[in-house]
């Protein structure tokens, strides 16, 4: 490798081309050949085998056991809200109020969303957001009136007169 570098340096004019260099390179190659042959002989020699006695083997009594502290689980939101005490009513004015709806629903609080004060396009966007929110958290969404919706967490059962939505009510959810 040094020979190639040296030749490159001579070619580029960074080093002088010595005649002595060629004899040094031949001596270096001979030394390298002798070293490589010695390495080959060492590789061929079998490695010494070490015997393992049963006395030095691992015993289970020597195993270290760290002290374990049990971790108490926090009560889930379902257990906390089993005695439902709160329902949030939100009258959004713009799509920016979606954060408030999402945070309340995520905390397990049923939300009544009244979009009567919103424009048609923003109301559709907010209903679409709410439908995705309810789907992601496994809840349900129901229409109370034309522009009022109830978002219920999965553990809340809504009992009403008419369980089946008519085609006209279902068409509002169809965004296509």
From Swiss-Prot:
One of its GO terms (biological process) is division septum assembly. Residues 17-45 have a biased composition (Basic and acidic residues). It is found in: Cytoplasm. It comes from the Bacteria. Gene3D superfamilies: SepF-like protein. Pfam families: SepF. Residues 13-65 are annotated as: Disordered. The keyword Protein transport does not apply. Cell division protein that is part of the divisome complex and is recruited early to the Z-ring. Probably stimulates Z-ring formation, perhaps through the cross-linking of FtsZ protofilaments. Its function overlaps with FtsA. This is Cell division protein SepF. It comes from Pseudarthrobacter chlorophenolicus (strain ATCC 700700 / DSM 12829 / CIP 107037 / JCM 12360 / KCTC 9906 / NCIMB 13794 / A6). The gene is sepF.
């Amino acid at each position: 490798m040094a020979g190639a570098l040296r030749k490159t340096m001579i070619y580029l004019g960074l080093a002088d081309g010595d005649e002595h260099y060629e004899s040094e390179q031949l001596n270096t190659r001979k030394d390298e050949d002798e070293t490589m042959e010695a390495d080959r002989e060492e590789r061929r020699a079998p490695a010494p085998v070490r015997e393992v006695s049963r006395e030095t083997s691992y015993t289970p009594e020597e195993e270290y056991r760290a002290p374990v502290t049990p971790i108490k689980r926090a009560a889930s939101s379902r257990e906390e809200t089993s005695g439902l005490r709160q329902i949030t009513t939100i009258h959004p004015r713009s799509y920016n109020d979606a954060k408030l709806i999402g945070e309340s629903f995520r905390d397990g609080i049923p939300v009544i969303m009244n979009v009567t004060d919103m424009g048609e396009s923003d109301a559709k966007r907010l209903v679409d957001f709410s439908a995705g929110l309810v789907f992601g958290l496994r809840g349900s969404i129901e229409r109370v009136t034309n522009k009022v919706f109830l978002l219920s967490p999965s553990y809340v059962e809504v009992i009403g007169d008419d369980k089946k939505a008519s085609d006209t009510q279902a068409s509002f959810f169809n965004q296509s």
